[in-house]
């Protein structure tokens, strides 16, 4: 059931971009919570990726269920999203850690997953800086990962637009809700000038207004956060809608496509056929 639809005047801009794929030029596409055993939602979202034809496919954790084993990656993930492996930039989720040290994840993605046993890394794409974190490893201030994040953001201060992604959301109206465990990382991203944050974990789609680390609307410096746990796994029941949630779709599967510009971005949530939920819009970098 669709709880709320958000309308924005970006459809014409997205359609006018031109370029590759049925959807016009696309810079980047993302979703998490993907391949779930005999459930075939991941095959439906993979067909969307065929049509969108983005140069970067980002995963937002929980790539395969239930335990992220080598066998599950081969037999489940690989048959659907695996065909985009050469352009995938993954992040790891809690279900991968049901296998010791998330070994199935690191074995499957190899160097694409960042340093083995860590899983955090960054890269540049179309003039944007993208930061991938491991929210199953400590992110508190002073930890190895947090220190790396602060240094990485400082080194890339000259980049106008920054996007980060990891598995556990800072805010969510879904079953699991927002996680305090990522607060220090969110604060570092905010201080470092990040513009967009993508997460998964809860199996729905949600978009929040640009917020500061304690959840206040901040149009000037706030990070626009998305929950995109819609890669194929079964949906969860929703809780009460969190403050400043601007778009919310449950019982929906699909992917978030983005178009990057030097100082701004456009987004569009594309649902699988038969699901009528849609969200799109645009934002400016800080």
Regions found by a protein language model. Give the residues of each.
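Short hydrophobic/aromatic-rich beta-strand segments that constitute the beta-sheet cores
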Residues: 132, 265-269
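Active-site flanking residues adjacent to catalytic metal/cofactor-binding acidic residues
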Residues: 32-33, 61-62, 93, 166, ...
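Short, solvent-exposed aromatic-acidic interface loops
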Residues: 268-278
């Amino acid at each position: 059931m669709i709880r709320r639809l958000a309308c924005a005047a970006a459809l014409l801009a997205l359609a006018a971009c031109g370029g590759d794929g049925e959807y016009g030029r696309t810079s980047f596409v993302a979703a998490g919570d993907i391949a779930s055993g005999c459930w075939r939602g991941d095959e439906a979202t993979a067909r969307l990726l065929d049509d969108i034809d983005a140069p970067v496919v980002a995963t937002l954790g929980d790539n395969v269920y239930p335990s992220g084993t080598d066998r599950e990656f081969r037999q489940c993930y690989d048959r659907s999203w695996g065909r985009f492996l050469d352009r995938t930039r993954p992040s790891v989720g809690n279900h991968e850690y049901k296998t010791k040290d998330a070994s199935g994840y690191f074995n499957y993605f190899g160097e694409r997953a960042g340093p083995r046993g860590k899983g955090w890394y960054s890269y540049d794409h179309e003039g944007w800086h993208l930061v991938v974190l491991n929210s199953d490893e400590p992110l508190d201030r002073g930890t190895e990962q947090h220190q790396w994040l602060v240094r990485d953001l400082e080194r890339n201060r000259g980049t106008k637009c920054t996007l980060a992604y990891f598995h556990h959301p800072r805010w969510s109206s879904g079953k699991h809700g927002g996680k305090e465990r990522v607060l220090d990382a969110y604060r570092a991203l905010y201080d470092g000038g990040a513009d967009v944050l993508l997460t998964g974990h809860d199996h729905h789609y949600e978009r929040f207004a640009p917020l500061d680390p304690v959840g206040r609307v901040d149009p000037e410096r706030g990070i626009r956060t998305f929950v995109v746990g819609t890669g194929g796994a079964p949906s969860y029941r929703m809780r009460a809608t969190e403050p400043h949630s601007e778009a919310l779709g449950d019982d929906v599967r699909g992917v978030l496509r983005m178009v990057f510009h030097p100082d701004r971005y456009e987004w569009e949530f594309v649902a699988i056929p038969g699901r009528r939920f849609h969200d799109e819009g645009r934002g400016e970098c800080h």
